[in-house]
Amino acid sequence: MQRRIMGIETEFGVTCTFHGHRRLSPDEVARYLFRRVVSWGRSSNVFLRNGARLYLDVGSHPEYATAECDSLVQLVTHDRAGEWVLEDLLVDAEQRLADEGIGGDIYLFKNNTDSAGNSYGCHENYLIVRAGEFSRISDVLLPFLVTRQLICGAGKVLQTPKAATFCLSQRAEHIWEGVSSATTRSRPIINTRDEPHADAEKYRRLHVIVGDSNMCETTTMLKVGTASLVLEMIEAGVPFRDFSLDNPIRAIREVSHDVTGRRPVRLAGGRQASALDIQREYYSRAVEHLQTREPNAQVEQVVDLWGRQLDAVESQDFAKVDTEIDWVIKRKLFQRYQDRYNMELSDPKIAQLDLAYHDIKRGRGVFDLLQRKGLATRVTTDEEIADAVDNPPQTTRARLRGEFISAAQAAGRDFTVDWVHLKLNDQAQRTVLCKDPFRAVDERVKRLIASM
């Protein structure tokens, strides 16, 4: 499948610092954030005009699920649009707090752990054909996903009883299973719950919950681009060396704790391989695969960055990727800070900087400041993100959903939507079922809109 439907769900961390005496719990802060959403959507679980879903998840975490996208840059743009949508709610909620005499600054973090050790996720969704053998997909994909943090981790300072250490991934410490149907209790790498949001006879949705939330656009593109390409190669029957891991849960932590990528991890049957070895195998197969697949500039850009990042890890010279990979950008920032102020990695100011990197408020968040200085590479523009805040992708089913929502809101009609249904809540209860996520034009939807 060279044209694949993809989406990203991001849970955001939320906190608030108060100027006055009154304090609010995280639940109350989240309710302030969603008050405007509830006022027009009558719920804290809504679909937006751009086709995305916005809701309050378990544990007061705002969650944004992008609309269905069918290209990498489109997905990165809509992922960034989610940050802007949440930032808009943040500004509105701060104004409400001020109006009610509760002065406070609200912070939304696009990260994966809070100071109490709780974890929240970034979930990737990839459409795959039902006909394939799912066990082969998971067998080949698992070693790739365990070691993928080497190229696209968000980076984190982990405080251990011995010392502070820099890790590649925020999520690695919180993963407890390889393949499972749970998402919160045991946190697997691949979630098997079968909800295709499409024609179930044709498709299933691969739900990957091991990845970090990325701030840098090129890192997000690398994360989803490499995974989608590995899936494409599996579907095409490309042979891979067997890197079945003896213990994926131990391996994911070992990889995260080693920025050199050279630490050997145990494979099934007693063999060993390093994260670098494993990633090199998938990368070299991808380079070969590019010779036979349809040319695609975005996919070629991904493979180029993949190779340059592996070279950088191998040589430990990151100069050629230090504006493109989150954990490399962050580590360089910490090192400069430590040198300038003569401080240890365990200094609380570094932990503060670690958190501030993920602050999504423009003009305040550290990553945003780096990006403005040209220290983080982009694949999209502010104009494209602003457009994605208001408009759905034009090449997928999301267009139908977005146009239906916009028309119903403009006509003042009561409606219900989810990923596959568009329904007018009138006497006739007219409903259109959109089972094909690739279909951006549908006469039935046009007629439903015309009837409003």
Curated annotation (Swiss-Prot):
HAMAP family: Pup_ligase
Gene Ontology MF term list: ATP binding; ligase activity, forming carbon-nitrogen bonds; magnesium ion binding; ubiquitin-like protein transferase activity
Cited PANTHER family: PUP DEAMIDASE/DEPUPYLASE (PTHR42307), PUP--PROTEIN LIGASE (PTHR42307:SF3)
Identification of the protein by name: Pup--protein ligase
Positions that bind Mg(2+): 9, 55, 63
Classification via Pfam families: Pup_ligase
Keyword ATP-binding listed: yes
Family: Belongs to the Pup ligase/Pup deamidase family. Pup-conjugating enzyme subfamily.
EC code: 6.3.1.19
